[in-house]
C-alpha cells in the first residue's frame, strides 16, 4: 500500500530472539526439538482419537480440535523463527507477514473459544450427566466447533484489515521473531490508535467471554462435586477437569499478560519471552497435559499398540 510519497516495503526484517551469534545454533536445536515434539504429540493425539471408537465423545472431539489448533499455531510461528537462527538477513515478505498475522489471530481466537467450549462440556458432563448424551450430541459438538472457527475467522479478518491500512515509511525492522501487532504498530508511520483500541476491545471481548464461561462452568462443577458423597466420585469428577484447568491457566494467563496491559507497561523484550511461551511452548505442553494420567488415552494407546503387534 502507498500513502502519499510513502510506499509500504515489500519485505520486513525480523530481529529474532537474539543477536548473539554463539546462541544461534543452540537455540535452533532447542526449538527444533520443541517443534518436532509439538507436531508428533499433537498429530499423534489427533490420529489416536480418530482411530479409537472409545474416544469418539464430545470431550475428545474438542481435544482433537485443540490439538489441530496447537499444531497449526506452532507451524505458523516456529519454522520462520528457526530460519532466523540460520539466516544473516532475517526477512519475511510483506504478504508473508500479513498471512502470518492473520493465521496467528485466527488460531489464538480459536483456542480461547475452544477452551471455553471445553469448560461448558465438562459442566454438562458433571452437573447434568443424565442429559449429557442428549445435550452434547456429535451434531451439536461440530456446530460449536464450526461456530467458534467462524467467529475466529471474522475476528482475524477485522484485525488484518486494520493492519493493511497502516503505512511503514520510516522502518521495516520488526523487533520480534514473528509478525505480531505491537511490534508492527511500533514501526508504523501512520496512526495506530484505532488498531490499538481494536486490540483492547476485541481481546477483552473474546478473552473475558471465554474466562467468564470457564469460571461460571467451574463454579457449578465445584458445587456439584462438593455434594458427591464418595471420595472416588469426587476424585473422578475433579480428575476430568484438572488437565483443562492447567491448560486454561497457562494459555489465558500468558495472553492476558500480553495483550490486556496498558501501552505504558509494554516492553518488547518482555513480550518476546511471553510470546515464546504461548506460541511455541504451550502447543507442546497441551497434549502432554491432556494425556498425562488420562486413563482413557492410555487405554486407547494400549489398544492401538496391541492391534499393531497382532497385525504383525
Curated annotation (Swiss-Prot):
SUPFAM superfamilies linked: Family A G protein-coupled receptor-like
Membrane-protein topology: Multi-pass membrane protein
Gene Ontology CC: plasma membrane
Cellular location(s): Cell membrane
Membrane spanning stretches: 27-49, 58-79, 101-120, 140-164, 206-226, 240-260, 272-292
Known function: Odorant receptor.
Gene Ontology MF terms: G protein-coupled receptor activity; odorant binding; olfactory receptor activity
Keyword Membrane attached: yes
Species annotation: Gallus gallus (Chicken)
Name of the protein this chain belongs to: Olfactory receptor-like protein COR2
